């Protein structure tokens, strides 16, 4: 697992470098959008990006609501985050909820909002939060050394993304930060080549991809643990069964039917066995018969001799032919003349 994480970190770094080399700087204005995304397990993602200044003509089509900015001085804070908002006014649940704010940082009188991630009846802190985001954006654009970099910050329970210093249209912004499915807007296409490996824009589609990947990785790891545990239990059970059979049945894996373990030799019998001589062994029954299965083998039915065959009838008995008689003694007769 450590090797996989190290590889992902390297890919994240490569992806960020790839993104930073593909963009060009646009003429930025003080008009920005700020997004707030909440989801399951306390996930909070915020994003800040530039916006074309002609967005006022499109607020009606998307249902944005205009609200007057309350008099708030944000200069006391240098690093505003969702902790500056009223926590009870942030809507959190088991599903993803988004809110998009639009404002002109040069006009501290009005802002527009769309979405349900924040309860806008809590107007005490929202104005200061948005003015703090304006301050962060100006600092990001003015002090950035490379205009083709992405800044991702982890602030405790919040992930904040400072987008490339470009200007995005309202259509693309709403589609990327409010829709979980659909085609990727062309303006955000540079960010999505390897989005499962890095949080670059804190968008809704990106959050779905990341969280689904993490969920699948978790299920895969749990499945591996379950399979490993099951295999281990099976192996331990088989090992115990083999050991029981080994010690219970005299080193046999399967006990014969009807077999009873004979008692082991006593110390006295062991001593007597040591005193046996060669002549005694020739006469004795095989040594250590109690440890062998000789008694069981001899008494088993498979070793009983079959009954003898009946005698053959006399007429079928064939006797071998008798040998020819030996010739009689031969006598020599000698005739003498008279």
From Swiss-Prot:
Membrane topology: Single-pass type I membrane protein
Positions annotated as glycosylated: 27, 54, 57, 68, 73, 79, 84, 108, 119, 143, 171, 178
Subcellular location(s) per record: Host endoplasmic reticulum membrane
Signal peptide interval: none
Keywords: Glycoprotein, Host endoplasmic reticulum, Host membrane, Membrane, Transmembrane, Transmembrane helix
Segments on the Cytoplasmic face: 245-338
Stretches that traverse the bilayer: 224-244
Highest taxon in the source lineage: Viruses
Family: Belongs to the HHV-5 UL20 protein family.
Name this protein carries in UniProt: Membrane protein UL20
């Amino acid at each position: 697992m450590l090797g996989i994480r190290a590889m992902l970190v390297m890919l994240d770094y490569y992806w960020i470098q790839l993104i930073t080399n593909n963009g060009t700087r646009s003429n930025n204005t003080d008009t920005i959008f700020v997004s707030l995304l909440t989801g399951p397990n306390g996930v909070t993602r915020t994003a800040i990006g530039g916006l074309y200044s002609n967005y006022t003509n499109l607020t009606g089509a998307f249902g944005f609501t205009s609200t007057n900015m309350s008099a708030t001085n944000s200069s006391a804070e240098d690093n505003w985050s969702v902790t500056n908002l009223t926590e009870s006014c942030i809507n959190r649940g088991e599903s993803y909820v988004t809110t998009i704010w639009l404002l002109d940082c040069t006009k501290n009188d009005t802002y527009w909002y769309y979405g349900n991630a924040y309860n806008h009846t809590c107007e005490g802190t929202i104005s200061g939060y948005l003015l703090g985001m304006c301050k962060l954006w100006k600092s990001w654009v003015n002090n950035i050394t490379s205009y083709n970099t992405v800044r991702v910050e982890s602030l405790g329970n919040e992930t904040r993304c400072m987008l490339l210093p470009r200007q995005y249209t309202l259509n693309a912004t709403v589609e990327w930060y409010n829709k979980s499915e659909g085609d990727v807007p062309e303006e955000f296409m540079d960010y999505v080549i390897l989005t499962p490996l890095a949080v670059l824009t804190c968008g809704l589609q990106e959050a779905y991809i990341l969280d689904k990947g993490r969920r699948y990785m978790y299920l895969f790891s749990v499945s591996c643990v379950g399979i490993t545990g099951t295999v281990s239990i099976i192996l331990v059970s088989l090992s115990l069964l083999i050991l029981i059979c080994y010690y219970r049945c005299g080193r046999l894996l399967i006990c014969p039917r009807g077999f009873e373990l004979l008692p082991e030799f006593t110390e006295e019998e062991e001593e007597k066995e040591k005193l046996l001589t060669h002549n005694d062994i020739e006469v004795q029954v095989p040594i250590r018969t109690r440890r062998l299965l000789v008694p069981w083998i001899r008494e088993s039915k498979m070793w009983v001799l079959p009954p003898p065959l009946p005698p053959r009838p006399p007429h079928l008995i064939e006797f071998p032919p008798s040998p020819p008689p030996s010739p009689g003694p031969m006598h020599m007769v000698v005739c003498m003349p008279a």
